[in-house]
A protein has these predicted regions:
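Adenosine-nucleotide cofactor-binding segment
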Residues: 186-189, 201-266
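NAD(P)H dinucleotide-binding glycine-rich loop of Rossmann-like/cofactor-binding domains
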Residues: 98-187, 326
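Glycine-rich helix-loop-beta junction characteristic of Rossmann-like nucleotide cofactor-binding loops
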Residues: 173-179, 202, 248-251, 271
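Glycine-centered, small-residue-biased loops immediately flanking beta-strands
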Residues: 277-278
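C-terminal hydrophobic helical "lid"/dimerization subdomain
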Residues: 1-2, 256, 260, 267, ...
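C-terminal substrate-binding/catalytic core of Rossmann-like NAD(P)-dependent dehydrogenases/reductases
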Residues: 238-243, 285-333, 342-343, 352-353
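Glycine-rich beta-strand-centered segment in the early N-terminal region that forms part
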Residues: 24-38, 52-105, 150-152
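Hydrophobic/small residue at the entry helix of a nucleotide-binding pocket
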Residues: 167, 192, 216
Length: 362
């Protein structure tokens, strides 16, 4: 086996091509994984449309949310809990971090390591070629930590845990405890927002209010634990949306706001937050001006980038232990074979689906 099929971006904003890409020799400690499922993320859509960041170049294999089965390992490896892994084990894995810089070794924040590297934007015409997840196989560098997937968790949900869900867990990790009388507002009803809705409800929020669009995503949010939802398409005025939140909070505003939409939603979220409240900023993209007049109100503002390795474990544990409480599979709302990747990306871009998954024969 010298090569495999992959979905390759060869030109921005043009249909991806299904091309054969070399399967590389494994350096010591590297792993070759046969992909079972790769969920798509809004970031994949942004990279497809462009522009690329200065470090990126065409062509590249799209996708950065993989789950797969180990095909081969060059040497011996253990998972993040120290247990041996081998061919046939179903895993997800972390990004690359150097392990020796200040952020990795002293601050213990590898998510901001200057040498951090992730997937879905790496040149597919240069070794090690297979660094995108919408492919039959993927190369896992030796620096990556391996996380075994519990039997109770589907491959599609595990793939989503490899980016979207672990980022949400990072946000809740930074937020800390939710007090039972608190009202939590979730800004965004995509995969991150609906997962955050479930986590907030599970952690004891008195009331979870989810704001987003379109209606099909909000319907999922209600089944994920939202006590009330507000459709942005139906309520277009910001003041009306702020008033809606205040109606549920005796005029004070929310105790916690978790923004999982984009930067433009942050000023709106701050307007919904009570004095002394806590704000978690996860969603990125776009530009916004932060209203500094809110800062004297003793707010606590957390920003979140990606996740730490423990957050993969936390996301998988939540999926496993709460599978009978929340309908996680509803968030993976459409499945496509590799040949239909362009259809999947278009459905994601137009919000027709909450989160699509590309599946591969096992």
């Amino acid at each position: 086996m010298n090569d495999c099929r992959a979905a390759v971006v060869t030109a921005l904003n043009q249909p991806l091509e299904i091309l054969r890409v070399p399967i590389p020799e494994l350096e010591p400690g590297a792993v070759l994984v046969k992909i079972v499922a790769s969920t798509l993320c809004g970031t994949d859509v942004h990279r497809w449309h462009g522009p690329l960041s200065p470090k990126d170049s065409l062509p590249f294999i799209t996708g950065h949310e993989p789950c797969g089965v180990i095909e081969a390992i060059n040497g011996r490896r253990t998972d993040i809990l120290g247990q041996p892994v081998g061919p046939g084990d179903r895993i997800v894995w972390s990004y690359v971090a150097c392990g020796s810089c200040y952020y990795c070794s002293v601050a213990l924040q590898p998510c901001i390591c200057p040498g951090r590297a992730s997937w879905g934007h790496n040149p597919s015409d240069k070794y090690p070629y297979l660094l995108g997840s919408v492919a039959e196989y993927m190369y896992v560098p030796p620096e990556c930590l391996l996380i075994r997937v519990p039997d109770e968790v589907s491959s599609a949900s595990a793939a989503a845990a490899a980016c979207a869900y672990r980022t949400v867990m990072h946000g809740f990790d930074r937020l800390g405890k939710i007090v039972p009388n608190e009202t939590v507002v979730i800004l965004g009803s995509g995969p991150l927002g609906n997962f955050a809705t479930a986590v907030a409800k599970d952690r004891g929020a008195k009331r979870v209010l989810t704001i987003g669009a379109p209606a099909n995503r909000l319907a999922v949010a209600k089944r994920m634990g939202a006590d009330a939802v507000l459709d942005l398409d139906a309520v277009s005025d910001l003041e009306d949306r702020v008033a809606w939140v205040r109606e549920y909070t005796a005029g004070r505003g929310a105790d916690v706001v978790i923004q999982v939409a984009n930067n433009a939603a942050t000023p709106e979220g701050l307007a919904m937050l009570r004095p002394g409240g806590r704000f978690v900023h996860i969603g990125s993209g776009g530009k916004a001006e932060i209203p500094v007049d809110k800062l004297p109100e003793q707010l606590t503002f957390y920003t979140v980038r990606s996740g730490e390795p423990r957050h993969w474990l936390q996301a998988l544990e939540f999926l496993s232990s709460r599978k009978d409480v929340f309908p996680f599979e509803e968030m993976i709302s459409a499945s496509y074979p590799l040949e239909r990747v362009n259809e999947a990306l278009a459905a994601m871009a137009s919000y027709e689906v909450v989160k699509p998954v590309i599946t591969f024969a096992t």
